[in-house]
């Protein structure tokens, strides 16, 4: 007589079957790579050492870089222009960021065409008119976060720069009232942090269990989004009502010096009827806050680190500010007049990029470039940006910080419009390039220059005696995590 299956066994079988169904229905299907593509692999959670080895072994051809979590087909810098010309329907940057940040749970990579056009065109157009208002927002942010320091005061840089940028940008996007609301600022700061932690948890979890664990891992992300939705809804309802009642909507979109940037009106004017629901606008605001805050904060963090390491630069930069500013006000432009500051910022950006890579793309179709085999759909491709930023053939003493590097290069006849912080190209990989370049780089440029100008005018900055330069940590997706222990000494000048 056959023994009956116990209820406990049945439950165990049911759970196992459910896990298998979830796993096979949601797992990432890895593309089959061509055999002639060399592989550089290491039992490591990051790409740093893998890239160094790959660059040495295969300087002029692509290779497959494999760490414990991701596989990227890495192309040499010579392929930069080829990759930037690949259309989005063949090779997508949005899909890359969606994949790396679990976009189905976080919204990342869900940027709509109207949102991107709003950032590229409408937001960029209003930046010059907003400079002096954003100077006021910057003063408010620094006074509330750093404050007056009659004696040398140690400031932890990571969270300080994060909060400063979050406040400055929030005042522009959602207005001073909500932008100074600690609940909103905290939610903006929490957004990338809870996503990062959730992705780390998922990466460490066995693949079979990830579908089951995801709702729990991303619960803090969802709760943070609910908080942002609750705070945004009254403002958006008011904005939508004003837009609906206004006959001359071009007046709403006209660049103005005061008030918040009319981001809601910009979005409503670009969405088709029925698309611009309040839910869609909430997602757009969450995304623009996520996309604009951590990367700009990281750049400001490194700028302060370099200023602390090179305090002699401060007087040179202050003299330039004195020549450009009138009654304490910066010009209402994209601030290209600040040529030495621009050079300082670009040099910091060169030495301290966000990622080891540039032009990261997920392929929707097979792609064959001038070197290497055909790469199948589903693969992630990228350019070795570190090989550009630290190239001895491009830059003299590439591992050294030279605040005048790009200022001096622009003095060469024919270079007047080259080597700016905002420039994209094969010698400036930080913003990406082509039709999928960073759409918010003009806004980031403005934020950085206004914040840096405030620091130079109001504080002396130096390293703490005996401290070491910040130590960056490479992450699984190729990005760098700033040193959370880095600090600088601030002292008020007046």
UniProtKB/Swiss-Prot annotation:
InterPro entries the UniProt entry points to: Cyt_P450, Cyt_P450_E_grp-I, Cyt_P450_sf
Sugar attachment sites: 445, 477
SUPFAM superfamilies: Cytochrome P450 (SSF48264)
Pfam families on file: p450
Main enzyme class: oxidoreductase
EC numbers for this chain: 1.-.-.-
Keywords attached to this entry: Glycoprotein, Iron, Membrane, Metal-binding, Monooxygenase, Oxidoreductase, Transmembrane, Transmembrane helix
Residue numbers binding heme: 438
Subcellular location, record wording: Membrane
Transmembrane segments: 5-25
Membrane-protein topology: Single-pass membrane protein
Main location class: membrane
Cofactor: heme
GO MF terms, alphabetically ordered: heme binding; iron ion binding; monooxygenase activity; oxidoreductase activity, acting on paired donors, with incorporation or reduction of molecular oxygen
Gene Ontology terms: cellular component: membrane
Pathway(s) it belongs to: Mycotoxin biosynthesis
One example of a Gene Ontology biological process annotation: small molecule biosynthetic process
Gene3D superfamilies: Cytochrome P450
Superkingdom: Eukaryota
Function description: Cytochrome P450 monooxygenase; part of the gene cluster that mediates the biosynthesis of a family of the mycotoxins cytochalasins E and K. The hybrid PKS-NRPS synthetase ccsA and the enoyl reductase ccsC are responsible for fusion of phenylalanine with an octaketide backbone and subsequent release of the stable tetramic acid precursor. The polyketide synthase module (PKS) of the PKS-NRPS ccsA is responsible for the synthesis of the octaketide backbone. The downstream nonribosomal peptide synthetase (NRPS) amidates the carboxyl end of the octaketide with a phenylalanine.
Family the entry assigns: Belongs to the cytochrome P450 family.
Protein name: Cytochrome P450 monooxygenase ccsD
Natural source organism: Aspergillus clavatus (strain ATCC 1007 / CBS 513.65 / DSM 816 / NCTC 3887 / NRRL 1 / QM 1276 / 107)
Gene, per the UniProt record: ccsD
């Amino acid at each position: 007589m056959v023994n009956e299956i116990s209820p406990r066994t049945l439950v165990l079988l049911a759970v196992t079957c459910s896990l298998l169904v979830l796993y096979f229905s949601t797992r990432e299907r890895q593309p089959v790579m061509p055999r002639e593509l060399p592989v550089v692999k290491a039992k490591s959670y990051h790409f740093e050492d893998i890239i160094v080895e790959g660059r040495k072994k295969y300087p002029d051809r692509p290779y497959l870089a494999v760490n414990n979590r991701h596989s990227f087909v890495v192309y040499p810098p010579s392929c930069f222009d080829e990759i930037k010309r690949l259309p989005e329907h063949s090779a997508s940057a949005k899909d890359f960021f969606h994949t790396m940040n679990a976009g189905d749970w976080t919204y990342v990579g869900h940027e709509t065409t109207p949102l991107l056009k709003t950032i590229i065109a409408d937001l960029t157009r209003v930046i010059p008119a907003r400079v002096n208002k954003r100077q006021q927002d910057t003063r408010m942010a620094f006074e509330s976060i750093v404050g007056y320091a009659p004696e040398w005061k140690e400031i932890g840089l990571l969270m300080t720069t994060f909060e400063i940028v979050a406040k400055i940008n929030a005042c522009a996007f959602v207005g001073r009232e909500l932008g100074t609301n600690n609940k909103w600022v905290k939610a903006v700061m929490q957004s990338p942090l809870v996503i990062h932690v959730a992705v780390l948890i998922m990466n460490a979890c066995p693949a079979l269990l990830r579908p089951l664990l995801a709702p729990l891992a991303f619960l803090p992300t969802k709760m943070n989004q609910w908080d942002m939705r609750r705070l945004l809804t009254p403002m958006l309802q008011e904005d939508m009502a004003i837009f609906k009642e206004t006959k001359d909507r071009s007046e709403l979109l006209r660049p103005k010096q005061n008030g918040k940037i009319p981001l809601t009106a910009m979005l409503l004017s670009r969405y088709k009827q029925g698309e611009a629901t309040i839910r869609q606008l909430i997602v757009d605001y969450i995304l623009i806050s996520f996309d604009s805050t951590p990367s700009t904060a990281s750049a400001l963090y490194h700028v302060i680190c370099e200023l602390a390491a090179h305090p002699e630069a401060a007087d040179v930069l202050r003299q330039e500010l004195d020549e450009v500013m009138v009654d304490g006000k910066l010009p209402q432009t994209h601030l290209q007049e600040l040529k030495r500051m621009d050079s300082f910022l670009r040099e910091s950006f060169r030495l301290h990029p966000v990622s080891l890579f540039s032009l990261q793309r997920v392929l929707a179709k097979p792609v064959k470039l001038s070197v290497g085999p055909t790469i199948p759909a589903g693969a992630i491709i990228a350019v070795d940006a570190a090989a550009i930023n630290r190239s001895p053939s491009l830059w003299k003493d590439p591992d050294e910080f030279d605040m005048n590097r790009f200022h001096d290069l622009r003095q060469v006849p024919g270079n007047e419009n080259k080597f700016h912080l905002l420039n994209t190209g094969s010698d400036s990989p930080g913003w990406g390039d082509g039709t999928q370049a960073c759409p918010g780089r003009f806004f980031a440029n403005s934020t950085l220059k206004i914040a840096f100008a405030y620091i130079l005018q109001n504080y002396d900055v130096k390293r703490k005696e005996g401290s070491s330069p910040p130590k960056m940590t490479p992450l699984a997706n190729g990005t760098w995590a700033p040193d959370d222990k880095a600090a600088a000494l601030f002292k008020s000048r007046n």
